[in-house]
């Protein structure tokens, strides 16, 4: 299955970040399209306070200690590879699409320290933390082929332990692209995702404190093809006081982040503000799944 250039760029969570694509290409007055949330509060997990908070949240939800330690080793590898002034010192507030770094310069810094190894993206990171809350039937065999996962799989060949104990078969079952109807109706695409995951034997273990948040994109590589793919994904954690924390890897060569939100509406506004950046297209808008249901 061949993907068009736009799909490939988005599907990688881009080496330079989907956030870069989301921030360009608009001109004129699009104020009516702006999300309700225009500021975010986030940390790059480069300080002891936010790291301890995340460790506690993950442990409280039942994420195994081995997965937590594996995650933080890769956070440290990334943070140690880039300039410290590009990272937050604890939680900081910023405009929705603002970054403290130039993504091209950050990519150069990463490459200087890590060579051709691309690093870890949103999909690898989410699976590494969420894997114990996901089940895939033993006979699920997905051949990713020329799928959106080709750079992911190159990274996993170099570091197969990056999935935290999950298998490559599980990774493919969750993230491989799906054939879809040629429609802009979100309801029908949600049904496609649910049915395809079911056919692959993908099920989610119910836990209100930890959820997988997946942003699906619709693309038409050719006139005859229509597909859905995971353009971004992260892990949502709920603290005892109800505060929401969203853990993500922005892109292969962009930072880890933990964002703090008051409710799911704010989280949805954040994700759609970054990724729902097209207009007048003949494809469906991105949509957000919470585990295997459309996020409210």
Task: Please tell me what each predicted stretch does.
Residues 1-11:
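Bacterial N-terminal signal peptides that target proteins for export
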